[in-house]
């Protein structure tokens, strides 16, 4: 993989905060040309460094919240198979694999109504085989969300 220069890193940081900026606006912020920004964005997309341009909705205003599933997969199970099942579930919006007490963390989009949220969590859990331990936490607010 090619080395990223200072402009690449600045570009990624700016886009992670506002992906709607035009190439002209980005060029002004970075002190370069629109053409150079366009080439850099294209290259970062081709390399898979920029995977998508998206928004961060206000879940509170949409009457939704996240249920965080902290999952410990049995040692006899394939963690990647469990992750694939979760990845394919339409309500799982963020999926993380890690090392520690829990080896999978899934963020499930659920209604704010706690009874409906519980039903949605149960729908996701019943699809998973090989759970050794599970904790569910509900996120009531996200005061900060930054990627870089």
Curated annotation (Swiss-Prot):
Domain of life: Archaea
Residues in the DNA-binding region annotation: 23-42
Keyword Metal-binding attached: no
Keywords: DNA-binding, Transcription, Transcription regulation
Molecular function in Gene Ontology: sequence-specific DNA binding
A Pfam family matched in the record: HTH_24
Name assigned to this protein: Uncharacterized HTH-type transcriptional regulator PF2053
Organism of derivation: Pyrococcus furiosus (strain ATCC 43587 / DSM 3638 / JCM 8422 / Vc1)
